[in-house]
């Protein structure tokens, strides 16, 4: 079994390589290369001669279409473990002409837009070096298939303008640019020091192959190096590892020789006894010919500070005299990284990175300020913390970025390059490699739903930096201050002079003091009135001793949560208790951005494809920020898709950030409303109206009342497994519509109880979006905890506990959940002045809890009796219940929590789950079940059985990888069938008359031909209809049923005929399709032939892999651009894609703008656009077309 590595030339994504395979020139070139290799025409005649086996004895393997088949070559006994084979001798003139004929023109040889401009060989080097550097990994899997590289470069000529780079980097012709791999094992990762923006960072996103990008191979040596790589390809795993790098042995002047297998030696001697095998150069030559140019290190010891989100990294460097030229000199054993588990986050670290160039080692150590807290939040959950100056657009739209590479490389030679790779810190070229994910070595199974296994969130989004290279975030000690982050639109970070910066800070502090005085005067007469835009938050809070109340409709005064102010910021807000909506939020860190880098990639993706629009957006952001009173300059919102000032209307209202899906940023600050289901954890925005009241007390602290303002500060509580397992009674919370109390209230006209319950419901703080203790599926709870546990940072945050809003008999205050830990009940204020208040508050809460629990224990028997009375009695009898009895029932109606694991339902036994359930029973008794379900009170989190009052929750397990695979409603059906089967059977249901609707005009529907069946069905529901409605007792009969088979055939044929008729009637004859078995092949072939017309394909792949709120807009817009192409089959495929990707959460306003720009720019880049204005039907397609 051979190990392989895949080689690509150019800067396109690997999954688009085959798009060029149908080009005649590429096939011609590949045939020429294949013939030259087979005929051994241009194999050098020096010591590196390679004598291949006869073709008949070669172990053949499949080669990609248009590729070159690699020949197995036996290694010599004298081969050494060096990386660089000797350069080829000068070839005969005829062979050079042949090679030149098969090459692209000189403009194409300028290679991809991501030439590593500083990765040059030593000027005195006799010939360019071919560095084949592979970082040693375990279980290395290197895939080699040389896939028509000439045409691959040739096809990228129009997209890459690299003349300036090519002129300044003549020695870079043989440089290899390594890229990120998807998995730790087999990762071939490296980068050149201070390398320019690289497109290869996005190359491994879609597939799991480990691919290497060659940035323009020298014309004279191209085929020679192909043979070298083919030679490496034929080695066994251990031999190649020993050949490429001496992993297990210490560095030696001449490493030990490899002993090839005796069997291969005999074959070699019998076939070509006089032809020596290639002998790579000894390591001594490696030390004289530096593969990577080493960036000059400052001659004085300098400590610089780098801001990576909330992590401070100090880099101390010493003068270096010894270049790092080989990976053997700097093995992975010399780097001591902090190895974090998956449940650990490094918060506000000060990490000292010492790079001692004399012994070529680096150490990571954490000082006393390091604060590591255990939580379920990972700053790297989506591998989104990548700061990579190597990335560029794979389509090569930005010629400016390529031209700027020279300037950046010349001017920034002293900068420290910070790259994120997926290996644990091998330093090949004087760079600091820091793993943004603590990656696969620490948790190799990247199967977590929050962590895409293919790293598309970083690698496929044409990452961050377009126009700059080698710039890094160098900040002062106040790294939390957003005013000091000169973050440009292209993520180039300026190095700030320390002394200058101190002067600026002093000036800013003076300005801040003046502003603070002015704003305090304004706020003396103002308070913030919370007005909800959506009934989803129907509470009107007021403060009490515990911070919450249940009666008031308008707060006497409000304040901004302390999370909106940061005492460590250089420019704190004017007051820690107030928010002036005429000013923007000063501190970006007041909101949690740790999980918001995914959409940053979306911004950069749009910017990469919209270079012109990019500049406009940048100017807009700068203008908005320069107009602020706080003098925040050049701040582009790094972790949000919106302009932070876009939603502020002076002194009128200011909207709070949307509460978005976990692992996405607070994506919009504009005053917009978005309707979404509570399960998606997206709420509509709340507007803050500034109203002046001379009687309001501005000094009264108010607990934050709108959860959207402090979205990060919620502590979502997850139910305890022991409680579930032991059937511990857990509160379902006071969703009044979910409890029996509402049932009683609906039948009894008791104003006092109505008021209490209404107030209780009004004070339910975002229960529609919070994960209540008993009402969440495991998936949602896990991801939300990931979002919220971020907020344990030492900032002034209020921590809102998961209150159940239960009405107490004595004081109608909110009480927290039964199963909350005591540590979660206090307010998380970091101020030293609040320590005493925290302890007092904690003691009070503990006392309240004890009193409440004792009361509930006493009332439990009576409550059970009342519930039984409620179930068995009629409505008229409830008038006999007293108010006290109703109050005992209303706040908490317990009942056993039935968490249904569908695996146990279907495959369990009687001891575990009471016996198996037939799936057909849900169909046979569906009318009876629906009749019973009419009496059910339900929420989005759970349903309640009307017969036994059990709380029914669908439990996620290994058999349920998807959140909504089994709903709570379906679990309740199984509950009724298992525990209340007699009641289900005895339920009398009136038969419904099936109303037949004429659907003949709709091409998607077909009428069923079965006897007495008048259903109109689609191909999507055809199988379900046939099996359930006609062959439920014996599903196998549907295969032999003539009417079923006739229906299947007609559905497919009529489906296509009706669609064609629809297109013709709407003058869309270009979209007419034929129904045949080769339809998929036609689509794929035409896509390959028209790849130049589909510049958005890469973007579709990128955006589809970013599981964010805002990706739907990107996908649909890109697909709409593809619809405008001339290709008929491609248009049809685009319709399918649009259909399958049209069900995500609504996008935000700023995304709409960006995507409009994206559409405009991409349409300009498409060569053949048809501006069709006719509507394209959004129709579901058969499964065979959706592949």
Swiss-Prot record:
* Lineage: superkingdom: Eukaryota
Residue spans of biased composition, Low complexity class: 71-84, 104-124, 190-215, 248-274, 458-490, 543-570, 585-653, 662-689, 752-790, 797-809, 1079-1149, 1156-1174
Natural source organism:
Dictyostelium discoideum (Social amoeba)
PANTHER family annotated for this entry?
NUCLEAR PORE COMPLEX PROTEIN NUP1
User: Where would you find the membrane-spanning parts of this chain?
Assistant: none
Q: Which cysteines are joined by disulfide bonds?
A: none
Question: Which ranges are annotated Polar residues under compositional bias?
Answer: 38-57, 443-455
Which spans does this entry mark as compositional bias, Acidic residues? 815-832
Name listed for the protein in its UniProt record: Putative uncharacterized protein DDB_G0291812
Q: Where is this region: Disordered?
A: 38-127, 189-215, 248-287, 358-415, 443-490, 536-689, 752-840, 1079-1187
């Amino acid at each position: 079994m051979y190990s392989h590595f895949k080689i690509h030339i150019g800067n396109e994504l690997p999954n688009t390589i085959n798009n060029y395979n149908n080009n005649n020139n590429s096939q011609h070139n590949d045939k020429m290369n294949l013939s030259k290799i087979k005929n051994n025409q241009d194999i050098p005649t020096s010591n590196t001669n390679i004598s291949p086996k006869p073709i008949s004895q070669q172990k053949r393997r499949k080669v990609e279409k248009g590729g070159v088949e690699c020949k197995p070559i036996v290694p010599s006994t004298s081969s050494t473990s060096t990386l660089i084979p000797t350069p080829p001798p000068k070839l005969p003139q005829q062979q050079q002409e042949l090679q030149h004929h098969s090459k692209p023109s000189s403009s194409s040889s300028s290679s991809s837009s991501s030439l590593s401009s500083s990765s040059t060989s030593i000027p005195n080097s006799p010939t360019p070096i071919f560095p084949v550097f592979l970082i040693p990994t375990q279980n290395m899997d290197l895939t080699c298939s040389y896939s028509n590289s000439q045409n691959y470069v040739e096809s990228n000529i129009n997209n890459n303008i690299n003349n300036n780079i090519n002129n300044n980097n003549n020695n870079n012709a043989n440089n290899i640019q390594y890229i990120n791999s998807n998995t730790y094992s087999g990762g071939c990762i490296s980068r050149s020091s201070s390398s320019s923006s690289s497109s290869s960072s996005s190359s491994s996103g879609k597939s799991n192959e480990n691919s290497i990008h060659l940035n323009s191979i020298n014309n004279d040596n191209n085929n020679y190096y192909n043979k070298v790589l083919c030679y490496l390809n034929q080695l066994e795993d251990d031999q190649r590892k020993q050949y490429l790098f001496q992993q297990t042995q210490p560095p030696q002047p001449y490493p030990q020789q490899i002993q090839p297998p005796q069997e291969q030696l005999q074959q070699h001697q019998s076939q070509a006894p006089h032809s020596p095998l290639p002998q790579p150069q000894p390591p001594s030559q490696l030390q004289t010919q530096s593969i990577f140019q080493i960036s000059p290190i400052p001659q004085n010891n300098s400590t610089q500070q780098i801001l990576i989100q909330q992590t401070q990294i100090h880099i101390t460097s010493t003068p270096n005299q010894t270049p790092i030229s080989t990976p053997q000199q700097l093995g992975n054993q010399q780097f001591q990284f902090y190895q974090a588990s998956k449940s650990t986050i490094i918060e506000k670290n000060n990490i000292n990175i010492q790079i001692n160039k004399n012994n070529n080692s680096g150490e990571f150590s954490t000082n006393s300020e390091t604060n590591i807290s255990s939580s379920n939040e990972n700053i790297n959950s989506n591998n989104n913390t990548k700061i990579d100056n190597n990335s560029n657009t794979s389509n090569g739209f930005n010629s400016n970025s390529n031209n700027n590479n020279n300037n950046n490389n010349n001017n920034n030679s002293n900068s420290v390059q910070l790259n994120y790779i997926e290996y644990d810190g091998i330093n090949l070229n004087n760079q600091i490699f820091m793993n943004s994910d603590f990656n696969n070595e620490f948790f190799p199974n990247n199967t977590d739903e929050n962590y895409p296994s293919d790293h598309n969130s970083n690698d496929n989004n044409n990452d961050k930096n377009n126009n700059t290279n080698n710039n890094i975030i160098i900040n002062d000690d106040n790294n939390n201050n957003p005013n000091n982050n000169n973050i440009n639109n292209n993520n180039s970070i300026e190095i700030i002079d320390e002394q200058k910066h101190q002067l600026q800070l002093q000036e800013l502090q003076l300005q801040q003091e003046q502003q603070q005085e002015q704003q305090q005067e304004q706020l003396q007469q103002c308070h913030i009135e919370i007005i909800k835009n959506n009934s989803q938050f129907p509470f009107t809070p007021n403060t009490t001793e515990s911070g919450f109340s249940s009666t008031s409709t308008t707060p006497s005064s409000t304040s901004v949560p302390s999370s909106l102010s940061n005492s460590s910021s250089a420019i704190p807000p004017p007051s820690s208790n107030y928010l002036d909506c005429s000013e923007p939020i000063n501190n970006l860190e007041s909101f949690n951005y740790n999980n918001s880098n995914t959409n940053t990639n979306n911004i950069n993706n749009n910017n990469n494809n919209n270079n012109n629009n990019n500049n406009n957006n940048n100017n807009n952001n700068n203008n908005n920020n320069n107009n602020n009173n706080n003098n925040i300059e050049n701040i582009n919102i790094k972790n949000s898709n919106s302009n932070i000032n876009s939603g502020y209307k002076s002194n009128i209202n200011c909207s709070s950030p949307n509460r978005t899906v976990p692992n996405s940023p607070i994506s919009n600050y504009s005053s917009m409303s978005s309707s979404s289901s509570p399960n998606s954890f997206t709420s509509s925005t709340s507007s803050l109206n500034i109203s002046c009241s001379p009687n309001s007390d501005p000094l009264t602290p108010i607990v934050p009342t709108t959860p959207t303002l402090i979205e990060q500060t919620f502590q979502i509580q997850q139910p305890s497994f022991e409680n579930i397992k032991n059937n511990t009674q857990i509160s379902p919370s006071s969703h009044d519509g979910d409890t029996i109390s509402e049932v009683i209230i609906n039948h009894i006209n008791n104003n006092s109880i109505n008021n209490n319950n209404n107030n209780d419901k009004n004070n339910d703080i975002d229960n529609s979006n919070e994960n209540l203790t008993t009402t969440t599926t495991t998936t949602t709870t896990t991801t939300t905890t990931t979002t919220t546990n971020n907020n344990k940072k030492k900032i002034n945050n209020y921590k809102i506990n998961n209150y159940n809003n239960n009405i107490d008999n004595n004081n109608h205050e909110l009480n927290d959940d039964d199963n909350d830990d005591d540590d979660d009940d206090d307010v998380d204020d970091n101020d030293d002045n609040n320590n005493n208040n925290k302890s007092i508050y904690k003691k009070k809460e503990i006392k309240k809890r004890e009193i409440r629990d004792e009361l509930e224990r006493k009332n439990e028997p009576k409550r059970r009796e009342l519930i039984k009375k409620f179930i068995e009695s009629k409505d008229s009898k409830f008038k006999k219940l007293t108010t006290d009895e109703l109050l005992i029932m209303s706040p908490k109606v317990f009942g056993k929590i039935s968490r249904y694991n569908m695996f146990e339902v279907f495959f369990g036994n009687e001891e575990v789950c009471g016996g198996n359930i037939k799936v057909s029973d849900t169909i046979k008794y569906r009318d009876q079940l629906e009749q019973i379900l009419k009496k059910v009170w339900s929420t989005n989190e759970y349903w309640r059985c009307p017969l036994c009052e059990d709380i029914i929750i669908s439990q996620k397990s290994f058999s349920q990888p998807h959140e909504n695979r089994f709903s709570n409603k379906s679990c309740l059906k199984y509950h009724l069938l298992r525990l209340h089967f007699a009641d289900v059977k005895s339920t009398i249901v009136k038969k419904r008359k099936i109303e037949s609707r004429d659907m003949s005009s709709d091409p998607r529907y077909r009428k069923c031909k079965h006897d007495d069946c008048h259903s109109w069905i689609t191909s999507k529901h055809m199988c379900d209809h046939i099996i359930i409605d006609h062959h439920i007792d014996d599903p196998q009969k549907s295969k032999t049923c003539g009417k079923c088979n006739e229906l299947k055939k007609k559905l497919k044929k009529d489906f296509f005929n009706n669609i064609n008729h629809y297109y013709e009637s709407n003058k869309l004859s270009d979209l007419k399709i034929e129904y045949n078995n080769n339809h998929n092949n036609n689509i794929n072939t035409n896509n390959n032939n028209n790849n130049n017309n589909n510049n958005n394909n890469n973007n579709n792949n990128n955006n589809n892999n970013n599981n964010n709120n805002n990706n739907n807009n990107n996908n649909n817009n890109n697909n709409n651009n593809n619809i405008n192409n001339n290709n008929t089959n491609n248009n049809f495929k685009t319709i399918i894609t649009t259909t399958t990707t049209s069900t995500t959460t609504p996008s935000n306003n700023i995304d709409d703008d960006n995507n409009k720009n994206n559409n405009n720019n991409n349409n300009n880049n498409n060569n053949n656009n048809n501006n069709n204005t006719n509507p394209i039907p959004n129709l579901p397609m058969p499964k065979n077309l959706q592949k």
